[in-house]
Amino acid sequence: MDKYSINQFKNGLKLMLDSNPCSILNNEIVKPGKGQAFNRVKFKDLITGKTLIKTFKSGEFLEGADVMELDLQYLYNDGNAWNFMDPHSFEQYIIDGITVSSVKGYLVEQDICIVTLWNDNPISITPPNHVILEVFDTDPGLKGDTIGASGKPATMNTGVVLQVPLFVSIGDKVKVDTRINEYAGRA
């Protein structure tokens, strides 16, 4: 596998750190008033999902992670596993609940998701940036409700709970930003 110098670090680069594949979230070059410059790098461990911050001096190298990202279409959940398919080769992937647990509320049938494979095993799933979900349960809207800073909690048809404006009612379809779990507008 390739080795990467800290000069080559950029957001999204996949590297091996402590025997686990990690993705760089942020790379900051720090030049103290006295002493040698160093890089403060924020990583996301692709296996555990934890965020790590490490510092590296110039001249250090890290091994690249042998991970593969595939665009797969979400098909269905059979109760125990989530089924995905490659839309080009029609190869199917069955992914366990542990891998899917953090994003299962954003999985909508037929949507294309990015599935990261390491040693031919799925280790993470990235849903589309925005999904359309239906409001399953929320407090009823009152006459005169308008868009404002306040909101109310709403449960979506997939089980996700998020803050929505006061005018949203049960049965409405809303656009949700999956990166920050926020209401993004009406569908």
Swiss-Prot record:
Lineage, opening ranks: Bacteria, Pseudomonadati, Pseudomonadota, Gammaproteobacteria, Candidatus Pseudothioglobaceae
What this chain does, per the entry, is described as:
Involved in peptide bond synthesis. Alleviates ribosome stalling that occurs when 3 or more consecutive Pro residues or the sequence PPG is present in a protein, possibly by augmenting the peptidyl transferase activity of the ribosome. Modification of Lys-34 is required for alleviation.
Q: In which pathway does it act?
A: Protein biosynthesis; polypeptide chain elongation
- Name the UniProt key words of this record, in alphabetical order: Cytoplasm, Elongation factor, Hydroxylation, Protein biosynthesis
Cite a single GO BP annotation.
Answer: peptide biosynthetic process
Check the record and name the NCBIfam families matching this protein: efp, PRK00529.1
Tell me the InterPro entries matching this sequence.
Elong-fact-P_C (IPR015365), NA-bd_OB-fold (IPR012340), Rib_uL2_dom2 (IPR014722), Transl_elong_fac_P/YeiP (IPR020599), Transl_elong_KOW-like (IPR013185), Transl_elong_P/YeiP_cen (IPR001059), Transl_elong_P/YeiP_CS (IPR013852), Transl_elongation_fac_P (IPR011768)
Q: Where in the cell is it found?
A: Cytoplasm
Q: Main localization of the protein? A: cytoplasm
Matching entries from HAMAP family are given as:
EF_P
Q: Which family does it belong to?
A: Belongs to the elongation factor P family.
Mark the residues carrying the PTM N6-(3,6-diaminohexanoyl)-5-hydroxylysine: 34
Q: According to its UniProt record, how is this protein modified after translation?
A: May be beta-lysylated on the epsilon-amino group of Lys-34 by the combined action of EpmA and EpmB, and then hydroxylated on the C5 position of the same residue by EpmC (if this protein is present). Lysylation is critical for the stimulatory effect of EF-P on peptide-bond formation. The lysylation moiety may extend toward the peptidyltransferase center and stabilize the terminal 3-CCA end of the tRNA. Hydroxylation of the C5 position on Lys-34 may allow additional potential stabilizing hydrogen-bond interactions with the P-tRNA.
List the GO cellular component terms.
cytoplasm
One protein family per Pfam = EFP
Q: Which cysteines link up through disulfide bonds? A: none
The protein, known as: Elongation factor P
**What's the source species for this entry?**
Vesicomyosocius okutanii subsp. Calyptogena okutanii (strain HA)
GO MF, one annotated term = translation elongation factor activity
SMART domains (UniProt xref): EFP (SM01185), Elong-fact-P_C (SM00841)
